[in-house]
Amino acid sequence: INGTSYAIGGLQGQPVENFFLEKWMANLKPYPNAFQFEQVEIHAIKPRLNWKKRPEWMSVDQPWPSPGKEVVFTYKHPKLEVVVQVHYEIYDHMPVLSKWISILNRNDGAINIQSFTSEILACVEAESVVDDKINWEYPNMTIETDYNFGGMSSDNILFTSVDWKIDSLYQTQVNYRLQTPVTLEVAPKYGPNIQLDEGEEFTSYRVWELLHDSRDQDRKDLEKRRMLRAVAPWVTENPIMMHVRSAETEAVKKAIDQCAEVGFEMVIMTFGSGFNAEDDSPENIKRIKGLVDYAHSKGIALGGYSLLASRKVGGGNDVVMPEGKTPRFGNSPCLESHWGKQYFDKLYKIYRETGMDILEHDGSYPGDICASTEHPGHEGLEDSQWQQYQVIQEFYEWCRSEGIYLNVPDYYFLAGSNKTGMGYRETNWSLPREFQEIIERQNVYDGTRYKTPSMGWMFVPLVEYHGGGEAATIEPLKDHLPHYEKRLANLFGAGVQATWRGPQLYDAPATKQVVKKWVDFYKKHRAILDGDIIHLRRPDGRDWDGFLHVNPWGKEKGLVMLYNPLNESVQRSIQIPVYYTGIKNKIKVEWPDGKIEFMEKNEKGRIELEVNIPADGNIFVLLEEE
């Protein structure tokens, strides 16, 4: 604050850092010039943002906020009229802690908050290594924040808002150079460097800390996905989507009609369609509102695409990078420039006045800093990231409060987005169709380790995309119906939604029947398909592949989905880890032909299924409790 660093509470004087003995407590001393503890309060958890649920896209009604308690510690300084509160949230039935700080200025004038560190957590080292290492193993925790950007996975958190650091006090560690990363610090890489006027309050971003009880990868992945469903439950909304390639009125109406016929739930006027979210003219708003009303009359949600980052807008409105640095995507406007303010004004206006339900926000804000001193929304470099992030976070929170679905190719889940890319390479759609089938399943298999099925979208261009010609293209759909059905089975069988991009979903009665078959399959088993995935065998083209869907709270507690890429049927004995289904007694096994069998799990919590998977086909097996 105003150039001086202050500790918030805390004691010092511990003789060694390897362990702590209670008898040392009496000899510890406060940090000099620190804020001092005043009081502690316990409250019910309050929602950090308003969420208008879309139950038609959810298989389970998730509570909001997540049940638990908030604990607030208040600290004051003997010489400053500044109050600091340290907030914790603890949740029912989860080893998860959330933490953030708030600062209230009671001075007669403004203060400047240059930086903050909202968490300093000394942890037991994950490994005890004498020698130098390039890639250290970190303590067994999952860390998330709502200040994370610049990529589709949470790994970017180390570049935005947290760090694992060495502890200079830990002189008794094994590592010769004292380089073991044992201290978690939560702090922005820049700023915030903001002015806090008299009576104003500053609130930091939040961190969530999930403590794992095992290094078993499946168990850790389950724990992480459960945490995300609890603290960002809008990720469980999983609408069935189509990307219509043209935003012309009749093209959009055709897409809406076809979606309604086969059970799709959402139409997105995609990139390159001609939809312009920045056109807030009365004529455009009137036309789009007419399309929205038409879609709603058919039970279909409608919205469109807007590009934010990776574009150059000129006029002094682009980010000004320090020497030697470039924007994340080569070009980017500054969100706090004159253009940025007008851009968001237009988005608010067109979504308010048309009632659109979905925004596909490409690039989003990737965290680019800006050294300009001419932009109206920030002072210079040090506050530029913080101020730009506030703009995007406030907009996404508004979208959540309005029930506007957010497809964002960035990791904004905890700030309000619903879905990001599952993980794929776009140029793979120029490969022959038969190659795409297995690669698609690999992408789903890998992506659902770290995401729930509803958190990641896949992409299926029905028309030519990135080249490849006829061999790579699904249109005409009726001419490539077996391949089209495999793609439907790949994705609906995984509970993963794709953006099916083209002018139509079907072009013949037989095509329509196949699409409806798999939509009906997903809707019939939505609760289990939206549940967690236990990975059985990764696709490699050499044998069967598949996974086990689990939902311990549902009637259908398990759904085994198996695929055969070979040109001959395969008979296999497959171990199924039914432990994860929560079934305690006998297991009712329902085979694809309707045959019922009862089985008991072994001492490892598994059953053995003797399966016959047809050539170049798939099967699913349902598991229930007797």
Spell out what each predicted region is.
Residues F37, I194-H212, P614-E624:
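Short Pro-Gly-centered flexible turn/kink motifs
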Residues E248, I288-D293, S297, A301-M356, ...:
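Active-site-adjacent "subsite" loops/lids of carbohydrate-active enzymes
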Residues I392-K595, E608-N612:
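Active-site-proximal substrate-binding groove within the catalytic cores of carbohydrate-active enzymes
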Residues Q217-M266, T270-S273:
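An acidic-aromatic substrate-binding cleft motif
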Residues N238-T249, T270-I285, K325-F344, P376-Q388, ...:
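The substrate-binding groove and active-site-proximal loops of carbohydrate-active enzymes
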Residues I1-P181, Y190-P192, N585-E597, L609:
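Polysaccharide-binding surfaces and accessory modules of carbohydrate-active proteins
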Residues E600-E626:
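C-terminal beta-strand-rich structural cap/linker in extracellular carbohydrate-active enzymes
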Residues N27-W51, L210-K224, R287-R328, R352, ...:
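Glycine-rich, aromatic-flanked loop segments that form ligand/cofactor-binding clefts
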